[in-house]
Amino acid sequence: MFEIHPVKKVSVVIPVYNEQESLPELIRRTTAACESLGKEYEILLIDDGSSDNSAHMLVEASQAEGSHIVSILLNRNYGQHSAIMAGFSHVTGDLIITLDADLQNPPEEIPRLVAKADEGYDVVGTVRQNRQDSWFRKTASKMINRLIQRTTGKAMGDYGCMLRAYRRHIVDAMLHCHERSTFIPILANIFARRAIEIPVHHAEREFGESKYSFMRLINLMYDLVTCLTTTPLRMLSLLGSIIAIGGFSIAVLLVILRLTFGPQWAAEGVFMLFAVLFTFIGAQFIGMGLLGEYIGRIYTDVRARPRYFVQQVIRPSSKENE
């Protein structure tokens, strides 16, 4: 039997990108939720290259009297998951909770995640109830969840919700993974022995707009497909085999038709030949694009450039920049 260690210190990791309107409320509510735990805690706010006043507000929050806030400033925008990984590399708690800065997932749910983790779970996920998102966001989320479940075999209900709790050894394992395209909830479930999901409230966004545009969702879909599995390459080989068999069958059929109806039939079959040709060319371009995605991922990983660059770290105790 594995020994279950009680949670002694909680680290809350929150990526921030142009969230100056929501920051005061976010800090107040997250601090209140952590105070109610009766445990040691820290709140790590990672500025992901914001162009508004977010970074300055984070520095002020860290330097306030009695603050528990650690501000991590990245030199530019690297994306949500890279920013969270930057926060993971600076945590000191034995339970790490991730949370979005838009307050759609209430910080008041944090005590429930801590209580569930204290039962011995490595990962505590959440499922958003009564989602306050647009029809497009809900549909895209369902498609992504189904894709992940099919490729990973992990039947988790809501991979898109970033309100999650991870034991320290899970975070340490993720930090040892150096691939550039990282999707944290899936990566955590790969290392987790015991994982569970609990329902949580979901509020309407009060400040700003979602940072996930249509194109960013498309890019996320490509990242998920290419960083999780090589199944698309196997499917591409299968598709190529089917097309080759189909092409050979059509060639045999055309020879039979020519012998049956004579050479005058050949001119009438030109348009069908063009249709078949364009179908094959289209399939080839799809395959080339998919191979290009995989090769691009390999090229990016082989260069081994850091996935983020931390410009400053402001801790409340010393109030000095690292």
Swiss-Prot record:
- Main subcellular location of this protein, as a coarse class: membrane
Catalysed reactions, as listed in the record: UDP-4-deoxy-4-formamido-beta-L-arabinose + di-trans,octa-cis-undecaprenyl phosphate = 4-deoxy-4-formamido-alpha-L-arabinopyranosyl di-trans,octa-cis-undecaprenyl phosphate + UDP
Task: List the SUPFAM superfamilies.
Answer: Nucleotide-diphospho-sugar transferases
EC class: transferase
**Record membrane topology:** Multi-pass membrane protein
Look up the signal peptide feature and give its range.
none
Cytoplasmic topology ranges: 1-235, 291-322
Q: Name one GO biological process term.
A: 4-amino-4-deoxy-alpha-L-arabinopyranosyl undecaprenyl phosphate biosynthetic process
Spans through the membrane: 236-256, 270-290
Pathway where it operates: Glycolipid biosynthesis; 4-amino-4-deoxy-alpha-L-arabinose undecaprenyl phosphate biosynthesis; 4-amino-4-deoxy-alpha-L-arabinose undecaprenyl phosphate from UDP-4-deoxy-4-formamido-beta-L-arabinose and undecaprenyl phosphate: step 1/2; Bacterial outer membrane biogenesis; lipopolysaccharide biosynthesis
Give residue ranges on the Periplasmic side. 257-269
Q: Which InterPro entries match?
A: ArnC_tfrase (IPR022857), Glyco_trans_2-like (IPR001173), Glycosyltransferase_2 (IPR050256), Nucleotide-diphossugar_trans (IPR029044)
Establish whether keyword Membrane is in the entry: yes
Q: Where in the cell is it found?
A: Cell inner membrane
Gene Ontology CC entries for this record? plasma membrane
UniProt KW keywords: Antibiotic resistance, Cell inner membrane, Cell membrane, Glycosyltransferase, Lipid A biosynthesis, Lipid biosynthesis, Lipid metabolism, Lipopolysaccharide biosynthesis, Membrane, Transferase, Transmembrane, Transmembrane helix
Q: Kindly indicate whether the keyword Lipid biosynthesis belongs to this entry.
A: yes
- Origin: domain of life: Bacteria
**Similarity field:** Belongs to the glycosyltransferase 2 family.
The free-text function statement in the UniProt record for this protein reads: Catalyzes the transfer of 4-deoxy-4-formamido-L-arabinose from UDP to undecaprenyl phosphate. The modified arabinose is attached to lipid A and is required for resistance to polymyxin and cationic antimicrobial peptides.
What protein am I looking at? Undecaprenyl-phosphate 4-deoxy-4-formamido-L-arabinose transferase
Q: What organism does this protein naturally occur in?
A: Escherichia coli O1:K1 / APEC
